[in-house]
Amino acid sequence: MESSNGTRITWLGHSTVLIQTAKGTNILIDPFIADNPKFPVGFELPSKLDYVLLTHGHGDHISDVVPVATKHNSTVVAIYELADYVSQQGVKNTIGMNLGGTVQLEEVVATMVDARHSSGAQDKHGTHYVGVAAGYVLTIPGSPTLYHAGDTAVFGDMKLISELYQPEVAMLPIGGHFTMGPKEAAMAARFIGAKTILPLHWGTFPPLKGTPAELATLVDSGVRVVQWVPGDTF
């Protein structure tokens, strides 16, 4: 299930994805590994892992950022307060940014866009303010434009993301309960205008009941919902 343009997107369960470009830049989004019941057994991250992108501060999205970034000497990209928080936890290389901002990650242009979700980081000292939740648009030369929505509800300004960046492949949460479910994700797909949907944040835990099969019955004609399992590469 591999795309033909040279960019590979591997789903590692929940919202964790590995993006590998044709030029060899490797980007991991939302590292949830050790406690992720859907992380593919036996899968090993590439030794060269250039960047780790964080969408927000919840544990099921950042729990492995310190060991992963430390082992691979990765640069962590996150909203400013979250970048500062993981720096205090031991991450050496960070890029703090904010909504609407754009950074260059080798040949990849990464733009931080809005999401509608909470974003407190929890540890033994309590819950910490770490900025707001976000998504990312990734523009890669010779590749379809990618959108990782992070955790989010559907919101009208997804139409602005479509107008500004024209994402062609959208990674959307569909499980419901903590994010939008299939009904809302179908509306999000309509707002965004992407013709390929990669479903995330479903099936990991019992409350996340939405499925790609259900989403496929709700999207507009001509929109492909990829039916994948953790470990698959698109």
Model features per residue range: what roles?
Residues 1-26, 33-36, 104, 214-223, ...:
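Zn-dependent metallo-beta-lactamase
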Residues 18-58, 63-70, 118-128, 152-164:
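Pre-active-site segment of Zn-dependent metallo-hydrolases
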Residues 41-103, 108-119:
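Active-site HxH/HxHxD metal-binding segment of metal-dependent hydrolases
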Residues 87-102, 186-234:
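Binuclear metal-ion centers of metallo-dependent hydrolases, dominated by the metallo-beta-lactamase
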